Every structure is written in C-alpha cells, then in structure tokens.
C-alpha cells in the first residue's frame, strides 16, 4: 500500500466512544452529551471526521484524495462517515452488514436482523429508533441504499465475501444497484463499484491490497 505512494493513518475510534455496552455512556462524546440518543457508530464516524480535519492540514497529504476503509462495525462506521463528509473522496466499507451497506428489506438466508444485535449485546452501536424496530426490520422508514446514494458522486467501493451470510452480501449488491441510479443522475455511474471474494468475515491484508486496483479505477473516475 505504501509502495504505491499512499499514506496510511488509523483512527482509535474508542476515544470517541468505548466499544463496550456497559461503559460507553461514560466515555468520549457521551461525557459531553450525556442525554444523546445516537449510537456509538455515529460517534466513531465523528472521530473519522476529526482525523480528516488533521490530515488536511498536512502538506504531505493530497486533501482531495482521502479514502477511508473499515471492517464489520468499522464498515458501518466508514459508510456513515463517508456519507456525511464531502472531503472523503472514496469510501470502502468491508463486510459491513446490517446497519451498514446491506439492506434491511432484502436479506439472504442466515443474515443478521436487528434482533441479532440484542442477542449479541451490540445494539448500542445504533440509535434508539433503529433499536425500536426490533422484529420490524422491514418497517424502517428508509433503507441503507440511502447512505450509498448520499456519497454520490464521490467514490464508493463495497467489498464483501460470498460466505459471510451474516453480513448480507446479497443485500449490499441490491443496495448498490439502487444507489447507482443516483450516481447515474449525477453523471458518475462508474464511481460506485463492488468487489466480492470467496471467503468469510475478515479484512485480511491480502484483500486490502487486492482492492487497490478497483480503488485506482475509482480515483480516475472521481478525478483524484
């Protein structure tokens, strides 16, 4: 990655909110906004925005060419961060699943549902409205292709694994096809893309290196 002339930076999202259902309300942004109803994924997205604040001040950084990536809960986070910060040129959520790139209204067999996050204890990742739709996933007033479309006309690369049924790769593909209409309307149909692989729920170095090819093509498409 570095040999291609990229700069790599990481974000410690837990400084914005602890990844712990029992303690997160006593950390980070929640100490400033104790009555806040947002989940920790939005708090983590805010942390990415603050990292971008720092990056754009560095002369070594091409501020118009910032890309972000994240896996699983990190994938949910970067999708939201990319949708809400126009300074981010390319967004790459990996295996982000429900609450991320996958649709709630279209799920493959074995995919997570909102109730799954109650079982795992991770419902605190999301806001109260999302949690209130437990057992009513398809009744949410909007679906996640909206987040895809909010990134347009900037670059969006969705990476998924065929065997990661929990993350609903079929729902991600359907969401991307819907969002592509927004890209087409803005004259950037090729700025949204997807790369699927034979594997499970992982964000391996080899995978990150392999997506540099599609990222390079997106860079050309969005002009960075």
Predicted regions and their residues:
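Cap/lid segment of the alpha/beta-hydrolase catalytic domain
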Residues: 1-57, 100, 104-105
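Solvent-exposed loop/turn segments at secondary-structure junctions
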Residues: 8, 14-18, 73-75, 97-99, ...
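Surface-exposed acidic, glycine/proline-enriched linker/cap segments
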Residues: 31-38, 113-138
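Alpha/beta-hydrolase fold nucleophile elbow
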Residues: 60-72
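Alpha/beta-hydrolase-fold catalytic nucleophile elbow
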Residues: 69, 94-95, 159, 197
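Glycine-rich nucleophile elbow surrounding the catalytic serine of serine-hydrolase chemistry
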Residues: 70-81
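Hydrolase active-site cap/lid region
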Residues: 79-128
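Alpha/beta-hydrolase-fold serine-hydrolase catalytic core, especially in secreted/extracellular enzymes
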Residues: 86, 125-127, 139, 146, ...
């Amino acid at each position: 990655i570095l040999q291609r002339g990229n700069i790599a930076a990481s974000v410690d999202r837990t400084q914005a909110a602890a990844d712990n259902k029992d303690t997160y309300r006593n950390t980070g942004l929640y100490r400033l906004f104790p009555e806040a109803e947002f989940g920790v994924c939005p708090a983590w997205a805010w942390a990415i925005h603050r990292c971008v604040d720092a990056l754009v001040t560095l002369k070594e950084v091409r501020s118009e060419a910032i890309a972000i990536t994240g896996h699983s809960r990190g994938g949910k986070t970067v999708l939201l961060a990319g949708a809400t910060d126009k300074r981010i040129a390319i967004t790459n959520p990996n295996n982000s699943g429900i609450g991320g790139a996958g649709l709630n209204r279209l799920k493959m067999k074995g995919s997570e549902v909102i109730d799954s996050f109650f079982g795992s204890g991770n419902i605190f990742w999301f806001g109260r409205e999302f949690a209130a739709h437990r057992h009513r996933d398809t009744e949410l007033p909007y679906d996640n292709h909206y987040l895809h479309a909010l990134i347009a006309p900037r670059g969006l690369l969705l990476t998924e694994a065929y065997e990661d049924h929990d993350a609903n790769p079929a729902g991600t593909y359907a969401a991307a096809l819907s969002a592509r209409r927004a890209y087409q309307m803005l004259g950037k149909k090729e700025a949204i893309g997807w790369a699927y692989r034979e594997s499970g729920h992982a964000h391996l170095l080899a995978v990150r290196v392999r997506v540099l090819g599609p990222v390079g093509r997106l860079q050309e498409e969005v002009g960075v």
